[in-house]
C-alpha cells in the first residue's frame, strides 16, 4: 500500500497487555500511521499526557508474517520524549486497501504495540482548553479537571466548521485483503482513533494502558470488507509565552514542528473562521465549485473558474468555449503593436481598434487596454503620488461608514472579495474613499462599488482609481451624483429608443406603467456587472471603453427586445409583477456572449441618435421639472472622443527655437520669466580691417558661424506697437461689423420697398378691377332705363303691347 510514504500497519494488542518494541522493516521510512480497521472510523479525544517521539528516532510498526520482517532484529529503544498535554485535529482519509498479506494475529497475552511515528504532517493545533470552532471530526476536549480520571477517553459531539478538513467517502476494498479489527492508533497529542469495536483511549505513561470500559476489542480476522483509514496525527505545539500565536500555524507542509509567525496580510485561524463563516456557509450550498482539499489559513480552498469565481450565478465552470492558443497569441501581438503607436491608431485607424474591441480584448492585456482606451494611463502619469495623498487624507465619516458596510456585498463569490478584511476589500475601500475626497461634490454612490470591484479584478488599486475617475467623469457623467438626475434622463432617452427598437415591448411597458428607472438603473449604473454572465460582462466592458455609453443602450435594448418583444413572451407577463419578475430573470440565450455581441453590433443606435433624443428629453425635462440641479460635464462617446478632447486641451506650441536664439527675444523672454535680462550684444569698434559680419548666438552654443544677412536688428515690435496693432484690428473689426449691419439694413429696406411696390401693384389691380365692375353696372342700368328699341327703330314690339292689340 503506497500513500506517498511507507505505510505502517499496526498489529492488534490485547487489553491490558504491555507495549513491546517492534522491529522496523528494512527500507521503511517515517510516514503517516496506517490503521487497518473494518467499519466506520471512530474519533475520540483525550487530554491525558502522551509520549512524543522526536523526528528521526521513531520506530515504525512492522507487519507480522511479511517476508522482510520474518526474522526481525532487535532495535535500540528510542529516547524518551517530554510529555505534552494538548489536543489536535486528526484528519482521516479513507482509501481502498491494496493487496496485502494476511496479518497473523498473536495468540499470546502480549502483542507488540505500534510505535509513534516521527515526521508526520503538521496540522493546525489548538491549545488545551481553548475555545475552538465546531468541527465535524473532532473538537478539542477541555483539560482534565481534578475529578476527571486521566485515562478516561471523552467523546465529543461534532459539527461542521468552515475550513475543517473532513474525511473522504470510503472506497470499495479489493477482494482478498485481510485485516484485523479493533486496531487502535495513538496520536502524539492524546487523540486516539480506533476502528469498529475498539473504543479505548490509550495513555503513554510508563507503558501502561488504562482500563478499557468497552472490554477487549480484538475481533476476528478474515477478508476485508471495510476501507483502510490513513490517520494523519499532529502533535500539539509546545507551550509558549504567548498562546495567541497558536491560531496562526499553517497546514501547508509536512514536518513543521513548531508554531510559525502570522503573515502580515493573513488572518489567524480563529479570525478567518469567525469572519468568513457566513460566506462559506452560503458557498457550501453551491456544489458546482467543490473539489479542492488544500488549505490557506485553515480554510479549505475551492475550485474557481478562470475568472476567480467560487460559485454563484456568475460562475462559468468549464462549459465556455475557449479561443485557440495561436489565435490568442496573434491577437496579443496586434494589441501590443497598437499600444506602441496608440495615438496614430486612434486618430487614423479607429475603425480597426473598434473592430478588435468587439472581437474581445485578450485577457492578458485587458487591464492595459482599458487604461489606454479610457486615457486613465495618461491621467495617472500626470498625477504621480495623488492617489497616495488622497489615501492618507481623512475622509468624510458619513461616506466611510456607508462604504464599509457595502464592502462585503461586492462579489462575495469571487476569491478576491470572499474574505472579510482581505486584500480585495481593503483595496476597494481605498479606492472608494479616495474618490469621495477627489470628488467631494459627488461623494459616494453604492453603484460605484461593483464598478470599482470589476476594475480591481484586473489592475492594481491606483490604476483602478484613475480608471474609475474616467468612467465617472467622461463616460457616465452625473450617474453617481446626488438625485440621480442623469440616470433618470437617460431612462427617458432609453424609453424613446425602445419605441424604435421594439414597439411591442414599448407598448407593453407603457400599458403596465413601468417606469424605466425600475429596471434599467442597475443595468446602466453597474454597466451590467451584476446582470450578465461574466464572459458577457467582459465583452460588454471591452466595447464600452471603446465606443462609450451607446453600448449600454444597445445591450439594454437587446435584452428587452428578446424578453418582451414577441406575443408569445408577453403571454406570461399579464401584470406588472409578472413583467418585473421576467426582467429580473432574463433568458439565458440573450445573455450568451456571442449572441449578445452579434445583436449589439447590428443594432442601429448611434451617438447622433442618442444626442438628438437627449436634447429632446432635456427640453421636456425643463418644461415639466425645471432646470437640472446637477450639471455634469459633457458626455464623451468612447475613446476617440476622449482622445480628441485631450488634443484640444493641450497647450499651444511655444515659439520656435530659431526665434528664441536671437538676442532681443532672449532678453524679453528672460524678463518675462522673471530672470535677469541678458546683456546687450557688444558694440564692435571700427578697425582698419574689414568689419566681420554679425553672428548668431544660440542657446548653449558659441558664436561661430556668420549670419547670412547683414541685419542684426531683433525681430518683433514694441508693446506700444502691438497695442496699436490690436487697437487697429479691433477698429477694423468694428468697421466691418458696422458695414455688415448697414448692408443688412440696406437689404432690409430694399426688401421693404419691394414689398410696398408689390402691395401698391396689388392695390392698383384691385382698383382697376373695381372700376371695371362699376362701369359694367352703370351700362346695365342705362340699358334698363332706356328700354329695348321700338319697331320703327327696327326692333320687335313688346309682348304686352302685342297682347293688348290682340285683346281689343
Swiss-Prot record:
The modification Phosphoserine is found at residues 22, 141, 658, 661, 678, 687. The modification Phosphothreonine is found at residue 152. It is found in: Cytoplasm; Cell membrane. Residues 100-112 have a biased composition (Pro residues). One of its GO terms (cellular component) is cytosol. The keyword Cytoplasm applies. GO terms for biological process: regulation of GTPase activity; retrograde transport, endosome to Golgi. It comes from the Eukaryota. Changing residue 409 to L: Loss of GAP activity. Unable to exclude RAB3A from the dense-core vesicles, when tested in a pheochromocytoma cell line. Residues 360-548 form the Rab-GAP TBC domain. Acts as a GTPase-activating protein for RAB3A, RAB22A, RAB27A, and RAB35. Does not act on RAB2A and RAB6A. This is TBC1 domain family member 10B. It comes from Homo sapiens (Human). The gene is TBC1D10B.
Amino acid at each position: 500500500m503506497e500513500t506517498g510514504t511507507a505505510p505502517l500497519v499496526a498489529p492488534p494488542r490485547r487489553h491490558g497487555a504491555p507495549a513491546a518494541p517492534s522491529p522496523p522493516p528494512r527500507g521503511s521510512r517515517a510516514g503517516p500511521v496506517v490503521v487497518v480497521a473494518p467499519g466506520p472510523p471512530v474519533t475520540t479525544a483525550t487530554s491525558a499526557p502522551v509520549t512524543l517521539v522526536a523526528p528521526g528516532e521513531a520506530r515504525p510498526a512492522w507487519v507480522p508474517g511479511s517476508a522482510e520482517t520474518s526474522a526481525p532484529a532487535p532495535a535500540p529503544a528510542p529516547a524518551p520524549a517530554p510529555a505534552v498535554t494538548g489536543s489536535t485535529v486528526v484528519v482521516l482519509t479513507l482509501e481502498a486497501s491494496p493487496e496485502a498479506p494476511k496479518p497473523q494475529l498473536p495468540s499470546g497475552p502480549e502483542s507488540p504495540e505500534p510505535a509513534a511515528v516521527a515526521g508526520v504532517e503538521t496540522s493546525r493545533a489548538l491549545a488545551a482548553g481553548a475555545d475552538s470552532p465546531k468541527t465535524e471530526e473532532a473538537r478539542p476536549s477541555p483539560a482534565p479537571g481534578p475529578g476527571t480520571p486521566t485515562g478516561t477517553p471523552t467523546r465529543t459531539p461534532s459539527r461542521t466548521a468552515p475550513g475543517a478538513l473532513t474525511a473522504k467517502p470510503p472506497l470499495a476494498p479489493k477482494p482478498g485483503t485481510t485485516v484485523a479489527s479493533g486496531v487502535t492508533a495513538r496520536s502524539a497529542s492524546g487523540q486516539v482513533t480506533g476502528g469498529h469495536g475498539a473504543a479505548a483511549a490509550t495513555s503513554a505513561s510508563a507503558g501502561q494502558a488504562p482500563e478499557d470500559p468497552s472490554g477487549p476489542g480484538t475481533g476476528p480476522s478474515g477478508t476485508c470488507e471495510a476501507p483502510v483509514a490513513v490517520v494523519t496525527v499532529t502533535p500539539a505545539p509546545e507551550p509558549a509565552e504567548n498562546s495567541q500565536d497558536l491560531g496562526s500555524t499553517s497546514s501547508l507542509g509536512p514536518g513543521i514542528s513548531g508554531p510559525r509567525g502570522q503573515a502580515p496580510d493573513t488572518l489567524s485561524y480563529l479570525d478567518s473562521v469567525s469572519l468568513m463563516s457566513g460566506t462559506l456557509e452560503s458557498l457550501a450550498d453551491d456544489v458546482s465549485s467543490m473539489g479542492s482539499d488544500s488549505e490557506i489559513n485553515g480554510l479549505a480552498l475551492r475550485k474557481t473558474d478562470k475568472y476567480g469565481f467560487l460559485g454563484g450565478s456568475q460562475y462559468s465552470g468549464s462549459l465556455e468555449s475557449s479561443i485557440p492558443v495561436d489565435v490568442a497569441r496573434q491577437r496579443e501581438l496586434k494589441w501590443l503593436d497598437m499600444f506602441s503607436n496608440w495615438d496614430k491608431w486612434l486618430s487614423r485607424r479607429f475603425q480597426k481598434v473598434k473592430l478588435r474591441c468587439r472581437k474581445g480584448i485578450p485577457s492578458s492585456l485587458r487591464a492595459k487596454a482599458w487604461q489606454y482606451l479610457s486615457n486613465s494611463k495618461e491621467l495617472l502619469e500626470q498625477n504621480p503620488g495623488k492617489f497616495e495623498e488622497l489615501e492618507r487624507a481623512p475622509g468624510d465619516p458619513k461616506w466611510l461608514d456607508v462604504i464599509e458596510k457595502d464592502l462585503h456585498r461586492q462579489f462575495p463569490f469571487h476569491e478576491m472579495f470572499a474574505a472579510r478584511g482581505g486584500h480585495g476589500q481593503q483595496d476597494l475601500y481605498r479606492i472608494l474613499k479616495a474618490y469621495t475626497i477627489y470628488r467631494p461634490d459627488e461623494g459616494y454612490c453604492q453603484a460605484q462599488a461593483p464598478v470599482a470591484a470589476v476594475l480591481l479584478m484586473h489592475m492594481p488599486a491606483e490604476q483602478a482609481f484613475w480608471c474609475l475617475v474616467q468612467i465617472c467623469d467622461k463616460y457616465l457623467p452625473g450617474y453617481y451624483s446626488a438625485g440621480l438626475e442623469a440616470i433618470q434622463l437617460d431612462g427617458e432617452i432609453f424609453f424613446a429608443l425602445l419605441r424604435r427598437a421594439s414597439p411591442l415591448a414599448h407598448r407593453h411597458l407603457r400599458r403596465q406603467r413601468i417606469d424605466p428607472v425600475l429596471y434599467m438603473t442597475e443595468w446602466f449604473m453597474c454597466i451590467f456587472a451584476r446582470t450578465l454572465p461574466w464572459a458577457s460582462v467582459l465583452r460588454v466592458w471591452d466595447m464600452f471603453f471603446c465606443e462609450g455609453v451607446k453600448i449600454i443602450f444597445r445591450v439594454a435594448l437587446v435584452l428587452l427586445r428578446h424578453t418582451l418583444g414577441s406575443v408569445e413572451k408577453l403571454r406570461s407577463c399579464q401584470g406588472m409583477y409578472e413583467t418585473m419578475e421576467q426582467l429580473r430573470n432574463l433568458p439565458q440565450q440573450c445573455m450568451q456572449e456571442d449572441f449578445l455581441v452579434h445583436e449589439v453590433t447590428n443594432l442601429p443606435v448611434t451617438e447622433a441618435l442618442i444626442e438628438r433624443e437627449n436634447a429632446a428629453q432635456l427640453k421636456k425635462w425643463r418644461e415639466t421639472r425645471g432646470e437640472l440641479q446637477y450639471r455634469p460635464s459633457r458626455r464623451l462617446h468612447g475613446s476617440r472622443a476622449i482622445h480628441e478632447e485631450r488634443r484640444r486641451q493641450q497647450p499651444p506650441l511655444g515659439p520656435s527655437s530659431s526665434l528664441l536664439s536671437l538676442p532681443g527675444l532672449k532678453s524679453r523672454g528672460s524678463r518675462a520669466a522673471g530672470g535677469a535680462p541678458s546683456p546687450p550684444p557688444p558694440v564692435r569698434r571700427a578697425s582698419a580691417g574689414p568689419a566681420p559680419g554679425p553672428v548668431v548666438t544660440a542657446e548653449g552654443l558659441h558664436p561661430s558661424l556668420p549670419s547670412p544677412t547683414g541685419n542684426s536688428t531683433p525681430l518683433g515690435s514694441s508693446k506700444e506697437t502691438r497695442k496699436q496693432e490690436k487697437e487697429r484690428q479691433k477698429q477694423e473689426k468694428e468697421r466691418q461689423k458696422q458695414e455688415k449691419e448697414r448692408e443688412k439694413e440696406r437689404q432690409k429696406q430694399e426688401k421693404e420697398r419691394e414689398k410696398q411696390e408689390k402691395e401698391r401693384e396689388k392695390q392698383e389691380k384691385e382698383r382697376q378691377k373695381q372700376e371695371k365692375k362699376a362701369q359694367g353696372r352703370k351700362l346695365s342700368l342705362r340699358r334698363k332705363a332706356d328700354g329695348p328699341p321700338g319697331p320703327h327703330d327696327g326692333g320687335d314690339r313688346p309682348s304686352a303691347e302685342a297682347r293688348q292689340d290682340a285683346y281689343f
